[in-house]
C-alpha cells in the first residue's frame, strides 16, 4: 500500500480564531510496500490494470483497505525553527521532529457502480475546505486555488462541476448562483440577489458563528515584489536527508534508477552535469552513479547550477544554498521500517500439476486463508488437475496467463508427478527464478523441494547443509507431511515482504 500526504501546508483555526500550521497524512494500516523497478516494467506488459484489479478484488472479498488520517501540527511561533521554509512545498517535516497524530480513519468499503460517474468525474480542489481549515501563504497553493477551478471548467464542461452527484457536498449549499452550463440544482425562489425583500432576505451571507468561511486574520507587512523567498533556494538538504535515511537495498535501487535514467541521455555533458549536482547531495551517491555511467567524478562542480534566471535578475541570487547541515536520518522515510506483522491481502501462487500432494495443497491453502492471504493455483494448462488421491482441483491460471510479478510469494507443494511436470515446464522454471530474483518468499515441501533447490540454488537437493541460511533468505523447505510447519514459517517470512540479502549474492541466470 501507499502513504498519502499533501505537499502544502494549511492552517487549522479553532473556534477562538487561534491558528496553527498543519500538514495532512494518510497512513496505510497494512504498512508501506512497493514493487521493484524490474517488476513494475513487466507488470505494465503482463497486466496494465494490475493495481486497480488488486484494489477491486480486495474490496470485493471484504478485505477493505484502510488508512488512518494524521496531522503534523506546528505552532505559528515555531514556523522558522526547522532550518527550512515550512511554506516550501518541496519540503517535508521529519516525523521525528513533529510526530504524526492520527485522528481518523478512511475505509474503502465499496467498489464503484459506474467508473465514469463515480471516478472519472471527480473534481478534486484544494479550495474545497471544511470549517476549521484555512490556507497558508504557500505561493504554489495560492496558484492552485485558481488553476484547479480553471481546470474543472474545461475538464467537466462548465462552472457547475461541483453539482455533479459525485462532487455534490453532503452539507446543503445556499447561494445566489444561477444558470451556467450543466446546471443541476433547481431553485424555486424568486430572487437571485442580496439583499432582497421578496424572499425574506434569503439566501444571505453566513457569518462565522453560522459556519461561514472567514479568512484567518493574519498581520502582514513588506514590499510587494515578484521573487521567491531566499529560504526556497535550499534544494539539497532534504535530498541528503532522504538518501541517508534509506536502507542499503533502497540506496542500491536509487543508484540503479539514476544509472538507468541518466544512461538514456545522449549528451555526455548533461550526464556529467547531473553527477556534479549529485555531489551536492552525497559524494558516495555521485560516485556510484558515475561508475555505472563510465564517468569520472568532476574535478569541480559548476559555479552556476540554476540558469533559469529572470531577464533582469542576478544569476548569483538564484543559486541553490550550500548544504551546511549534517544530513541526519529520518527512519520514517524508509520502507524498511514499515509494519511487518501480517500477510492480509497478499497473493500467493501455488505451482502444481497432476499428482500434487493433497495434504500439502489443502493444508497450505487453509493456512493462507486463515492468515488473510489469497492462494491461486498456477499450472501448465487451465481446467482441472487431478491430485495424488484423485481429487479434482480447479486451476486459476496457466503459466501463459500469469506471471510471478503478479504475486507476492510462491509455494511448490509435494507430489512426484506434480514436481516432474514442473521440472519439464520451462515457464515454471522461469516463474520461480523470477520470483527469486525479485527477493520474494518461496516455499516447497516434499518433491517440490528438489524443484526449488535446482531452480534457485543450483543444487540437486541431495544435501541440506544450508537449510537455515536459505530460511533467512526467504526460502522455506520442508519434507513430506511438513505442510503445517512450513506454512507457519512461510507466513512469517512473507510478512517481511522481501528478502534483500539475495541481491548481494550472484543469482543463477
Predicted regions and their residues:
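Generic beta-strand/beta-sheet core signal
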Residues: 22, 70-74, 109, 351-353, ...
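Extended, subdomain-level signal for the structured scaffold at the beginning of enzyme domains
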Residues: 252, 256-272, 277-437, 450-509
Amino acid at each position: 500500500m501507499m502513504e498519502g500526504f499533501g505537499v502544502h501546508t494549511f492552517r487549522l483555526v479553532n473556534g477562538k480564531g487561534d491558528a496553527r500550521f498543519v500538514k495532512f497524512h494518510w497512513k496505510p494500516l497494512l504498512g508501506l510496500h512497493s514493487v521493484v523497478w524490474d517488476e513494475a516494467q513487466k507488470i505494465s506488459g503482463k497486466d496494465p490494470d494490475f493495481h486497480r484489479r488488486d484494489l477491486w478484488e480486495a474490496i470485493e472479498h471484504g478485505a477493505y483497505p484502510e488508512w488512518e488520517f494524521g496531522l503534523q501540527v506546528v505552532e505559528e511561533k515555531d514556523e522558522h525553527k526547522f532550518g527550512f521554509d515550512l511554506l516550501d512545498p518541496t519540503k517535508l517535516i521529519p516525523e521525528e521532529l513533529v510526530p504524526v497524530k492520527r485522528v481518523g480513519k478512511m475505509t474503502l468499503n465499496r467498489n464503484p457502480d459506474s467508473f465514469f460517474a463515480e471516478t472519472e468525474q471527480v473534481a478534486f480542489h484544494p479550495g474545497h475546505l471544511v470549517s476549521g481549515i484555512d490556507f497558508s501563504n504557500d505561493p504554489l497553493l495560492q496558484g492552485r486555488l485558481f488553476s484547479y477551478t480553471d481546470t474543472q471548467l474545461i475538464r467537466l464542461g462548465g462552472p457547475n462541476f461541483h453539482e455533479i452527484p459525485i462532487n455534490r457536498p453532503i452539507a446543503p449549499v445556499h447561494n445566489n448562483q444561477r444558470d451556467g452550463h450543466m446546471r443541476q440544482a433547481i431553485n424555486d425562489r424568486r430572487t437571485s440577489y442580496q439583499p432582497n425583500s421578496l424572499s425574506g432576505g434569503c439566501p444571505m451571507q453566513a457569518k462565522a458563528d453560522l459556519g461561514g468561511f472567514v479568512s484567518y486574520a493574519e498581520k502582514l507587512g513588506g514590499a510587494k515584489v515578484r521573487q521567491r523567498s531566499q529560504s526556497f533556494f535550499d534544494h539539497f538538504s532534504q535530498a541528503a536527508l532522504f538518501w541517508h535515511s534509506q536502507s542499503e537495498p533502497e540506496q542500491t535501487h536509487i543508484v540503479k534508477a539514476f544509472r538507468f535514467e541518466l544512461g538514456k541521455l545522449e549528451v555526455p555533458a548533461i550526464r556529467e552535469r547531473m553527477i556534479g549536482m549529485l555531489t551536492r547531495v552525497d559524494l558516495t551517491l555521485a560516485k556510484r552513479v558515475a561508475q555505472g555511467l563510465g564517468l569520472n567524478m568532476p574535478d569541480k562542480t559548476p559555479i552556476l547550477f540554476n540558469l533559469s534566471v529572470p531577464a533582469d535578475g542576478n544569476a548569483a541570487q538564484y543559486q541553490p544554498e550550500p548544504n551546511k547541515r549534517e544530513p541526519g536520518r529520518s527512519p520514517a522515510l524508509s520502507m524498511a521500517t514499515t509494519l511487518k506483522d501480517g500477510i492480509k491481502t497478499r497473493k500467493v501462487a501455488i505451482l502444481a500439476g497432476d499428482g500434487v500432494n493433497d495434504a500439502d495443497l489443502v493444508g497450505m491453502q487453509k493456512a493462507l486463508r486463515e492468515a488473510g492471504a489469497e492462494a491461486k493455483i498456477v499450472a501448465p494448462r487451465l481446467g482441472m488437475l487431478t491430485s495424488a488421491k484423485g481429487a479434482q482441483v480447479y486451476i486459476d491460471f496457466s503459466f501463459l496467463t500469469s506471471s510471478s510479478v503478479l504475486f507476492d510469494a510462491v509455494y511448490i507443494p509435494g507430489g512426484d508427478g506434480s514436481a516432474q511436470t514442473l521440472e519439464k515446464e520451462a515457464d515454471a522454471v522461469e516463474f520461480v527464478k523470477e520470483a527469486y530474483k525479485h527477493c520474494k518468499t518461496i516455499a516447497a515441501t516434499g518433491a517440490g523441494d528438489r524443484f526449488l533447490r535446482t531452480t534457485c540454488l543450483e543444487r540437486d537437493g541431495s544435501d541440506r547443509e544450508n537449510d537455515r541460511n536459505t530460511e533467512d533468505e526467504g526460502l522455506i523447505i520442508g519434507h513430506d507431511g511438513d505442510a503445517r510447519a512450513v506454512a507457519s514459517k512461510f507466513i512469517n517470512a512473507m510478512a517481511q515482504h522481501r528478502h534483500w540479502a539475495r541481491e548481494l549474492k550472484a543469482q543463477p541466470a
